[in-house]
């Protein structure tokens, strides 16, 4: 199974002078900047060309339920000519909340978009029934790094189960596209490659630029499963002037201050 990890295009929070969960000016569920919109159009064109080159290839597109990812995944799905399926567990660390983590007062949690709201605003997307009332429990406020690592670990288990099912013929073979977030992708890759997963200062990071594409191969072999990187942080579809994100310092702060934009 081939897995394509796509980070969302530049969000309004990404463009803040000081992006992070500690910034009171952050939005709980931001949209995209003009640069981000240009990035999604570049993604759409890239995947449209890929579809034209391999018209018989089967693909699946999965998306985080956060607005910046839905805007990005809609372009990915349009380019590939398929519908987008939404999974609540693909959201970014922190969840859906307003206010600054570590500021005065506790963060105020929100439910996030409901199934009806998502499918009305993003007609190409299909949201599951368990999102009838949203995807985030407001009582949780802001998700911790430890909780995010546990959640992403279960996503990794899901990906391996899909790879095995495709290998065994229990599920149609397809290339899997997941549109998610910078810190989510870092945690996922660390889990896949058995890198140390800690809180606070990190010894290593997998940094993703906005609207980048990673490609991995999940191999189910008789002597055991193996996953390998084939493409890392590909942004060749983006003109230099519209590239953004992916700094080491930015992702490092996401751990040391518990949160990213």
Residue ranges and their predicted role:
Residues 1-3, 92-120, 165-174, 190-261:
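Acidic, low-complexity terminal tails and accessory targeting/binding regions
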Residues 1-58, 74-81, 220-261:
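An N-terminal RHG(E/S)-centered segment typical of histidine phosphatases
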Residues 182-186:
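GST superfamily/GST-like fold recognition
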């Amino acid at each position: 199974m081939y897995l394509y990890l796509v980070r969302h295009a530049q969000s309004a929070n990404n463009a803040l002078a000081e992006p992070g969960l500690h910034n009171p000016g952050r939005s709980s569920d931001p949209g995209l900047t003009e640069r981000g919109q240009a990035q999604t159009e570049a993604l759409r064109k890239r995947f449209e060309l890929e579809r034209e080159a391999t018209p018989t290839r089967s693909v699946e597109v999965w998306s985080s339920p956060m607005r910046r990812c839905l805007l990005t995944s809609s372009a990915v799905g349009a380019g590939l000519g398929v519908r987008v399926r939404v999974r609540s567990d693909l959201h970014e660390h922190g969840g859906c909340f307003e206010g600054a983590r570590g500021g005065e007062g506790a963060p105020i949690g929100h439910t996030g978009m409901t199934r009806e709201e998502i499918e009305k605003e993003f007609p190409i997307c299909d949201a599951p029934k368990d999102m009838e009332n949203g995807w985030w429990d407001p009582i949780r406020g802001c998700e911790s790094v430890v909780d995010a690592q546990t959640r992403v670990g279960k996503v990794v288990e899901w990906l391996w189960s899909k790879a095995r099912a495709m290998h065994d013929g229990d599920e149609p073979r397809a290339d899997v596209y997941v549109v998610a977030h910078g810190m989510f992708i870092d945690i996922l890759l660390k889990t896949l490659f058995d890198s140390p997963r800690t809180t606070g200062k990190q010894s290593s990071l997998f940094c993703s630029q906005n609207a980048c594409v990673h490609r991995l191969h999940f191999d189910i072999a008789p002597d055991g499963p193996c996953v390998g990187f084939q493409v890392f942080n590909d942004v060749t579809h983006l003109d230099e002037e519209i590239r953004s994100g992916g700094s080491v310092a930015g992702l490092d702060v996401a751990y040391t201050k518990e949160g990213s934009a």
